[in-house]
Amino acid sequence: MSTILKWAGNKTAIMSELKKHLPAGPRLVEPFAGSCAVMMETDYPSYLVADINPDLINLYKKVAADCEAFISRARALFEDANREVTYYNIRQEFNYSTEITDFMKAVYFLYLNRHGYRGLCRYNKSGHFNIPYGNYKNPYFPEKEIRAFAEKAQRATFICASFDETLAMLKAGDVVYCDPPYDGTFSGYHTNGFTEDDQYHLASVLEHRSVLAGFCVDHAGA
């Protein structure tokens, strides 16, 4: 199953191999949600899905809460707004409007992801999404993926939190899948990046918490 979003480092293509390293357990915990490919390709009784990016978590919450309303509004936008000037107008509203609802911000986030350059997700130091227009002829509207996600999401809790906060919520028996951002990648880790110090801190936290949970850490840059 493909994911709702285009995403750098999406694990869909390697899930058949990755699943061999994920033990059984009552709950899968993901401190770095990304595209949610791991949630979509596994079958745990429940999930705790976290990310520090509020736009990402807002999207997942809105799709889970009202899949049909989300599809209706997003599909209309995809049908009518594949133009450069419209893309930048939507990006402007997404970044600066104080009146935009969380629902519309989720719709816009999907639109920007699918119409922006290479599906990248990047913010400037002010926290503004700054990916340029991708100039694609016919961006794919992931209706099938949205419906599948909404169904699986009924088993999940989505939180906007740092990896520290997420790992502090572990319970005995949890399975943790960690795919931290690569050092120095174009996509970054929200506004502040993910530094070498963050990598060491994550390793320390995982070691401290290992008595509670089983871990699978996937990081080509480690």
Question: PLM ranges: what are they?
Answer:
Residues N10, H21-E79:
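Conserved S-adenosyl-L-methionine
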Residues A172-A222:
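Conserved acidic-Pro-Pro-aromatic motif
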Residues P31-F32, A50, I159-A161, C178, ...:
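Short His-Asn-centered micro-motif
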Residues A24-R27, P45-S46, A153-T157, E207-A213:
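Short active-site oxyanion
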Residues F32-A37, E145, D218-G221:
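Short, polar loop motifs at secondary-structure junctions
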Residues L18, G34, Y60, L110, ...:
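A residue-level signal for conserved active-site and pocket-lining positions in enzyme catalytic cores
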Residues M1-A13, H21-A24, D66-Y177, P181-Y189:
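SAM-dependent nucleic-acid methyltransferase catalytic core
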